[in-house]
């Protein structure tokens, strides 16, 4: 952990993290590549699709936890592939059982298979139920500022608006909505979905997002481990740029050297 990270931590549900890059564990060619990419990213939180990745459900298959130990990483189970609140809640309960009472969970309830946009009605319903059951909910949602605030108000510990559709690689498509969400939030805002390359991650962080979560942008790259390293640097650079404060955009030039005392 570098000195800057230690002085500017990310806090989720009372836990302090030095890394602001959260990574997924799907789509890699094997568990060894998953491990190497996660290490290169410097992630401390890794998200796992309970319905797709084995963390103990099948004793006859390779177990992700053998390469990404819960002693080293915060395992963030997610409800990817769920299309109803009931399925999502059931999946979270299974994850809590598999992870010995682990309360932190990433909720996503999808609306359709083409866009993978969240079903906001089902998302709200599931979030309310999970909070009532004492889960610590990090929630994937649209970039609607009203909905984001509502999810915060019902007790979600982090709100995760999409930058663009899952896996699209389009980057931040509506920075003004994201800015509105960020400015009104009292919980961490984490861009989730749509990042394609390092500049996308930097832009999200420059806007003031607290962190970025990605999977496809790393796992789908020609060299996933190298891309993970690039994303780590982009997130760090974007955060520093946000804190430093960019100069205002101007229509005309402004000389960087003084005009007083010119020779001749």
Curated annotation (Swiss-Prot):
<comment type="function">
    <text>Catalyzes the rearrangement of 1-deoxy-D-xylulose 5-phosphate (DXP) to produce the thiazole phosphate moiety of thiamine. Sulfur is provided by the thiocarboxylate moiety of the carrier protein ThiS. In vitro, sulfur can be provided by H(2)S.</text>
</comment>
<dbReference type="GO" id="GO:0005737">
    <property type="term" value="C:cytoplasm"/>
</dbReference>
<dbReference type="InterPro" id="IPR008867">
    <property type="entry name" value="ThiG"/>
</dbReference>
<keyword id="KW-0784">Thiamine biosynthesis</keyword>
<feature type="active site" description="Schiff-base intermediate with DXP">
    <location>
        <position position="106"/>
    </location>
</feature>
<comment type="similarity">
    <text>Belongs to the ThiG family.</text>
</comment>
<keyword id="KW-0704">Schiff base</keyword>
<feature type="binding site">
    <location>
        <position position="167"/>
    </location>
    <ligand>
        <name>1-deoxy-D-xylulose 5-phosphate</name>
    </ligand>
</feature>
<keyword id="KW-0808">Transferase</keyword>
<comment type="pathway">
    <text>Cofactor biosynthesis; thiamine diphosphate biosynthesis.</text>
</comment>
<feature type="binding site">
    <location>
        <begin position="215"/>
        <end position="216"/>
    </location>
    <ligand>
        <name>1-deoxy-D-xylulose 5-phosphate</name>
    </ligand>
</feature>
<dbReference type="GO" id="GO:1990107">
    <property type="term" value="F:thiazole synthase activity"/>
</dbReference>
<dbReference type="GO" id="GO:0009229">
    <property type="term" value="P:thiamine diphosphate biosynthetic process"/>
</dbReference>
<protein>
    <recommendedName>
        <fullName>Thiazole synthase</fullName>
        <ecNumber>2.8.1.10</ecNumber>
    </recommendedName>
</protein>
<feature type="binding site">
    <location>
        <begin position="193"/>
        <end position="194"/>
    </location>
    <ligand>
        <name>1-deoxy-D-xylulose 5-phosphate</name>
    </ligand>
</feature>
<dbReference type="InterPro" id="IPR033983">
    <property type="entry name" value="Thiazole_synthase_ThiG"/>
</dbReference>
<comment type="subunit">
    <text>Homotetramer. Forms heterodimers with either ThiH or ThiS.</text>
</comment>
<keyword id="KW-0963">Cytoplasm</keyword>
<dbReference type="Pfam" id="PF05690">
    <property type="entry name" value="ThiG"/>
</dbReference>
<dbReference type="InterPro" id="IPR013785">
    <property type="entry name" value="Aldolase_TIM"/>
</dbReference>
